[in-house]
UniProtKB/Swiss-Prot annotation:
One Pfam family matching this protein: DVL
Source species: Arabidopsis thaliana
Record's protein name: Small polypeptide DEVIL 6
Localization in the cell: Cell membrane
Bilayer topology annotation: Single-pass membrane protein
Subcellular location, principal: membrane
Record GO cellular component, one term: plasma membrane
Alphabetical keyword list: Cell membrane, Developmental protein, Membrane, Transmembrane, Transmembrane helix
Amino acid sequence: MGVLKRRVSSSRGLGGVLREQRAKLYIIKRCVVMLLCWQD
């Protein structure tokens, strides 16, 4: 994970990092929603 982040920051700059952060947040939110649905 660290290597990927370093490559992204060096090639695409801040925009790439922000996009990666948004994608990670989206994935985490999806996981939380799925877990909550499963618990019902």
